Amino acid sequence: MKITRVLTAVAATSALALSLTACGAGGTAAPEDNTDKKTITVGFNPGPYQQMFEEGIVPILEEDGFEVKIEEFTDGIVINVAVAQGDIDANIMQHPVYMEFVNAQEGIDNAGLVQIPTPNMALFGGKKSTLDEVADGSTVTVPDSPANLYRGLLILREVGWIDFEDVDDPNTADLSIITDNPHNLQITPIENAQQVPSLQDVDYSTVQGNFILAGGLDYADALALENQPTEFSNVVTVRSADLETPWAKAIEAAYKSPEFIEFVTSNDDFDGFNLPE
């Protein structure tokens, strides 16, 4: 298996993103036509999706005659701008709600190509070990990004701890939508990456799936799993103009192939992942 890896420096790519933002990424010159390309460059943020792609998808693409290059990023905006500009062909790291948020913010036109297996967000106990131990004033952390905060609130509603007004756009959600909090839960949004390290300091936390895996938590210890809405299932992201290209269709077919599904379901590394319908 031949995979070329490039670590993309945040400083350099951030400067690019800022320049695109200033003039509108959507207003830049379109990338050269890449309809018949045989080398596919895919970007990843830290998380489980790169391993899944390299071990489960790349062999299929190579059998189809493609060479694959990997670029590693650490920023969700930069990696999307890189797709829009054509610096990379695709990224695999986000759900459509976040993708649309970045599209609107950056003035770009990326699209979801195919849903991929995605780990559930889950509720974990910190100082408390069961749902029954919830008490007046219990402390709960949720992700601080609006869309993932909304997912956290959905779990808290599913276990009967709160109620809130549904929103049409999860990217607008904040704690002000809560309408009923009978336990007077002290709900605090915090950075995703801090949820597992801070778990010992709070009673409960709703933790995003990739941070569950990266933080060494076990889904068997989760107190509740989200009923994952489709819009929060991660996707392969490409430029809208590339959706029908042969290389994009090859990626889509690989993710839908029986070989890949067998790879995921037989691999303990991907326990807790939801398969696309």
Regions found by a protein language model. Give the residues of each.
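Bacterial signal peptide processing site
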Residues: 24-27
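Short helix-initiation/N-cap motifs at beta->coil->alpha
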Residues: 70-81, 169-197
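Ligand-binding "clamshell"
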Residues: 101-113, 128, 201, 206, ...
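A conserved helix-loop-strand patch within extracytoplasmic ligand-binding domains
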Residues: 113-162, 261
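A bilobed periplasmic-binding-protein/Venus flytrap-type ligand-binding module shared by bacterial periplasmic
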Residues: 120-131, 233-247
